[in-house]
């Protein structure tokens, strides 16, 4: 932006920043106006120019910084390094409350062309600070205040988020949520087809409303299966989006089952892994059913429900609980194609569960990504365990029983988290 750069070099910092703001050059705005990323800086610019385009950036930045200060950072992250990494400023409660007071003043003093911006910012900060009623009042006021279409949309989304903290899940409220989610979906669809804008803003909005609002609301209302389904809905939408923009299906060697691996970085898998086999089966039955509630119907139709994936997960859960006969109906339907495209395929293909691990460690070439699996070892394991347990129940005391017990111990250890197989 040649004009903005010329303004900056001539000492007209605010004018230059306004020009960058108009053109949407966020990187340049941060460089030019970085010292104003605080309430004091916002007040200074507002006094100079109540309708400065730079204020749009600074207000948004301030609210984001309040959110980042309150949000949980990674456990192993140093505070200073983490905020530097995400380019955020720490905003504490006193300054945040002072901002709320200032934003409400600006939103009602008729000097700003866009009171919606200020009132919705006040609502979001109050929500983050736990001031529920004040946040709700400000959001309602913001929706009816003057602002750009994006500002008014943000105010509407903020109101939706605020309602999740204190509402009851009755028919009226779930109907409201369904309408708002469908509205967000329409906004997502529109922005995805507009190359001139960041194409994930409303997806980010929906993600926060789901994970910070709707998911915990269902959980605390005694509906854990719905809460998990809501979480999975967002995972699937995100995975579908990135699979499409990365053209994964057109890549050589692509296999859909490689997108269905179980790993600890997948928040939905982590939640499912904490369930018992019976609970996991109940969840699968729920997402493959047709709930009577319209909002729940909306959710389950958007969840991931591949039969191979869940057969593996449920069967393995039953196997882990020692319920081998119940595991077999699920494990026996697994295909070698699915098993060959799982992260543990190298172990299933090359390691044996009947080798005593206390004597032998089965090493593999860990550079392999996937390996061709030709035998369903989990199924074979379950059948062998049932046979050995049956033999043990009728074996005589002494060497025969000891031999069977040793074989059982070998297999139990190999099948555990300390073993080599899975």
Located regions from the model:
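Extracytoplasmic/secretory-pathway proteins
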Residues: 1-422
């Amino acid at each position: 932006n040649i004009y903005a750069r010329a303004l900056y070099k001539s000492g007209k910092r605010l004018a230059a920043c306004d020009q960058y703001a108009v053109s949407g050059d966020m990187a340049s705005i941060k460089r030019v106006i970085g010292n104003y990323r605080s309430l004091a800086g916002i007040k200074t610019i507002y006094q100079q120019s109540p309708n400065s385009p730079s204020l749009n950036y600074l207000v948004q930045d301030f609210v984001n910084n309040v959110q980042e200060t309150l949000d949980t950072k990674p456990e192993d992250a140093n505070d200073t390094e983490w905020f530097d990494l995400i380019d955020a400023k720490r905003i504490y409660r006193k300054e945040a409350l002072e901002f709320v007071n200032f934003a409400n003043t600006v939103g009602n003093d008729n000097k700003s062309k866009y009171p919606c911006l200020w009132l919705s910012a006040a609502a979001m900060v109050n929500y983050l600070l736990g001031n529920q009623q004040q946040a709700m009042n400000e959001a309602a006021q913001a929706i009816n205040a003057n602002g750009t279409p994006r500002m008014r949309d943000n105010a509407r989304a903020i109101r939706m988020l605020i309602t999740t903290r204190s509402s009851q899940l009755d028919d009226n409220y779930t109907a409201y949520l369904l309408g708002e989610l469908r509205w967000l979906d329409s906004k997502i669809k529109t922005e995805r087809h507009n190359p001139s804008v960041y194409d994930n803003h409303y997806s980010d909005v929906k993600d926060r409303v789901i994970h910070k609002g709707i998911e915990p609301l269902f959980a605390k209302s005694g509906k854990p299966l719905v809460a998990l389904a809501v979480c999975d809905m967002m995972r699937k939408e995100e995975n579908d989006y990135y699979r499409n923009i990365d053209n994964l299906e057109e890549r050589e060697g692509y296999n859909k089952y490689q997108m269905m691996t179980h790993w600890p970085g997948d928040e939905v898998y982590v939640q499912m892994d904490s369930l018992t086999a019976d609970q996991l089966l109940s969840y699968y039955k729920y997402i493959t059913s047709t709930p009577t509630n319209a909002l729940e119907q909306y959710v389950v139709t958007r969840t991931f429900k591949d039969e191979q994936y869940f057969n593996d997960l449920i069967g393995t859960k039953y196997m882990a609980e020692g319920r081998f006969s119940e595991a077999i109906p699920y494990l026996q339907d697994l295909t070698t194609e699915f098993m060959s495209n799982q992260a543990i395929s190298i172990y299933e293909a090359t390691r044996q569960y009947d080798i005593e691990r206390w004597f032998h460690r089965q090493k593999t070439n860990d550079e392999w990504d996937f390996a061709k699996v030709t035998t369903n070892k989990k199924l074979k394991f379950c059948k062998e365990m049932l046979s050995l347990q049956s033999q043990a129940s009728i074996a005589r005391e002494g060497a025969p029983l000891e031999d069977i017990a040793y074989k059982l111990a070998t297999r139990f250890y190999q099948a555990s988290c300390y073993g080599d197989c899975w």
